[in-house]
Regions:
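Active-site glycine-centered loops adjacent to acidic/histidine catalytic or metal-binding residues
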Residues: 262
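Histidine-centered divalent metal-coordination motifs
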Residues: 43-49, 192
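Active-site phosphate/pyrophosphate- and oxyanion-stabilizing loops and adjacent acidic/basic residues
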Residues: 74, 101-102, 129, 177, ...
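Mid-to-C-terminal alpha-helical segments outside catalytic/metal-binding sites
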Residues: 2-19, 28-42, 55-84, 247, ...
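Short, solvent-exposed turn/loop segments enriched in Gly/Ser/Thr/Pro and often Arg
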Residues: 88-94, 298
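Active-site gating/metal-coordination segments in enzymes
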Residues: 83-84, 93-171, 178-180, 222-228, ...
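Short, electropositive alpha-helical surface patch
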Residues: 95-110, 243-250, 275-282
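Catalytic pocket-lining loop regions of alpha/beta-barrel enzymes
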Residues: 146-258
């Protein structure tokens, strides 16, 4: 089985040096043919080595054995043909968004950030009105919030501030439905099809997909068709997951579905390029126009990323 280290070592090569050699070139995307499909990864994490100290302070344990830096990510994107990516800071780094914002500053065309914010901290409410004034910040990503009412302030505040919200909290579709209905101007994006490793292990995959599909009736809700290789029990092209992807595509349509990888998870399951071709070559029910939306146009439009 290919380890994460082997995957990176075999993929980076000379690309690592080229990613840092010319800052001016890094700021400007390469000229591409007019007909090229724009590929946007709706979820990638970045984590630098210094975060190990932060993890220790917070008493957290990282889920990846090594840092995954900007310098590692850029060559992977270049080789696979990924034009842009939405950085979602990993939950094990606490509520730090600084490294993701650093990536957006260094590569403003290629990266933007969905930042993390502590929902139980009463001081967080004051941050939302000016949240998007941080260069490169597009919105907020939340997961695992409490149902004790301590997070209730967040949804109307995010709606008022015009902040898109990505969320992952499987098994709580009824709660999401109430939020979507009460806040129709709030952009809500379900991460990873509403699935998690724990859901799969518990044998509740079909239930989770059904719940996510049920939210499609709310026009302000959309879904990332992301991380399928991580949950599949098969090798590429992960045909056991094709019916689930099809179910959500039929429910939401191409303009509310987004391709993404969460690339640091599941390196052994697929290369970055295979994660692209899984959608562009193996999902035969998708038209070319569908792929244009799902692979990039839709997430840019939904997040207002120009």
């Amino acid at each position: 089985m290919l380890s994460r280290r082997s995957f990176l070592n075999s993929t980076l090569g000379a690309g690592l040096a080229s990613a840092t050699s010319d800052q001016a070139a890094a700021q400007t995307p390469a000229v591409q043919p007019a007909c090229k499909r724009l590929i946007v990864d709706a979820q990638v994490p970045v984590l630098k080595a210094e975060s190990a100290v932060w993890l220790w302070i917070l008493g957290l344990k990282p889920r990846i054995p090594e840092p995954f830096t900007i310098e590692m990510l850029v060559p992977l994107m270049d080789e696979a043909g990924v034009d842009r990516a939405v950085i979602v800071p990993p939950d094990w780094s606490g509520y730090r968004n600084d490294y993701g914002l650093e990536a957006a500053k260094r590569y403003p065309y290629r990266f933007a950030v969905m930042g993390r914010i502590p929902l139980k901290d009463p001081r967080s409410a004051a941050l939302l009105p000016k949240w998007k004034e941080q260069p490169g910040m597009l919105g907020v990503r939340v997961e695992g919030w409490s149902t004790d009412g301590s997070a209730d302030w967040f949804w109307p505040a995010a709606e008022k501030a015009g902040l898109p919200v990505m969320f992952l909290n499987p098994g709580r579709a009824s709660e999401f439905a109430r939020i979507a209905e009460r806040h129709p101007q709030l952009t809500l994006i379900v991460d990873h099809m509403g699935v998690s490793v724990d859901v799969v292990k518990a044998g509740k995959l079909l239930e989770a997909i059904d719940q996510t599909a049920s939210l499609a009736k709310y026009p302000n809700v959309s879904v990332k068709l992301s991380a399928a290789p991580n949950y599949s029990t098969e090798a590429y092209p992960f045909r056991d997951f094709t019916p689930h992807i099809r179910r959500l595509f039929d429910a939401y349509g191409p303009q509310r579905c987004y391709w993404g990888t969460d690339i640091t998870n599941g390196f052994a399951k697929a290369t970055y390029k295979e994660r692209i071709t899984h959608f562009t070559e193996e999902l035969t029910f998708l038209s070319e126009q569908d792929k244009d939306w799902i692979m990039g146009r839709a997430i840019l439009a939904r997040l207002g990323w120009t």
